[in-house]
């Protein structure tokens, strides 16, 4: 557990959210085989009551000081327990902080509560990781996500994911591999472990692209795609999508 990275968030969260906090949980790469060079610190906060606009503003201002730059990026999500327990789909995300939204934050655009299918796999990972930073085990606060809702959620995000293929190539390819892996096996794996699984099953012509994405993720290669390799990115992504759609079409 990356204690220094995650623990430094606790005073900030307690100061801003106070007694509304029910639990704070580590998840993501830190609990799926360990942090990689490009990994975020992923934290979920479960609260009693919805955050106020003032609290969301304060969270953004404080998180921008400690996330990114010389420190690891932070992805922090707040959910109201009553919005996710009892479980219903799609769940509501009360607050989201991620470095990809920094430009919005700097323009004064605050995150607002909204439905978020992505919470289905996230809450599943939180429950599996069972890594509280504060509060009881997550199973005492969260209901399990039904498998059908998990499958629906991870497929729902594919079209939006594809719009980022040229700008966030590594992450998109690894995420597609993880979606395929999860649909096929029912297990949520780290991105590099999902890539390992997919590489053993992909046609040979698509393996170099995914292998390169995996190597960048692990810090074994620079974030650079040569012209020849980049021309093969779209065909590889299309193949992964066809494999995902094939499983989806067979699911009742």
Task: Tell me what each language-model feature is.
Residues 1-25, 54-56, 248, 252:
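Helical scaffold of the NTase/Pol beta-like nucleotidyltransferase catalytic core
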Residues 2, 165-172, 229, 233:
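Aromatic-acidic/polar surface patches that form glycan- and anion
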Residues 24-65, 72-80:
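Catalytic metal-binding acidic patch
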Residues 61-166, 173:
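Conserved NTP/Mg2+-binding pocket subregion across the NTase superfamily
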Residues 155-212:
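Extended, basic/helix-rich recognition subdomains
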Residues 187-252:
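Structured mid-to-C-terminal alpha-helical surface segments
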């Amino acid at each position: 557990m990356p204690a220094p990275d995650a623990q430094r968030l606790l005073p900030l969260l307690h100061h801003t959210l106070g007694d509304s906090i029910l639990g704070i949980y580590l998840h993501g790469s830190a609990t799926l085989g360990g942090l990689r060079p490009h990994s975020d610190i992923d934290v979920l906060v479960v609260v009693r009551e919805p955050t106020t606009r003032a609290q969301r503003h304060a969270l953004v201002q404080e998180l921008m000081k400690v996330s990114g730059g010389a420190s690891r990026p932070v992805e922090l999500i707040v959910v109201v327990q009553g919005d996710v327990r009892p479980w219903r789909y799609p769940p509501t995300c009360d607050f989201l902080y991620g470095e990809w939204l920094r430009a919005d934050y700097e323009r004064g655009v605050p995150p607002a509560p909204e439905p978020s299918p992505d919470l289905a796999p996230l809450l599943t990972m939180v429950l599996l990781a069972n890594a509280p930073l504060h509060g009881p085990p997550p199973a005492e606060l969260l209901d399990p996500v039904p498998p059908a809702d998990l499958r629906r959620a991870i497929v729902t995000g594919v079209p939006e994911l594809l719009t980022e293929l040229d700008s966030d190539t590594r992450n998109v390819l690894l995420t597609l591999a993880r979606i395929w892996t999860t649909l096929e096996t029912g297990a949520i794996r780290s991105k590099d472990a999902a890539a390992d699984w997919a590489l053993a099953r992909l046609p040979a012509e698509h393996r170099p692209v995914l292998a390169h994405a995996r190597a960048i993720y692990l810090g074994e290669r620079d974030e650079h795609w040569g012209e020849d390799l980049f021309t093969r990115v779209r065909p590889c992504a299309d193949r992964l999508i066809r494999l995902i759609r094939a499983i989806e079409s067979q699911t009742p």
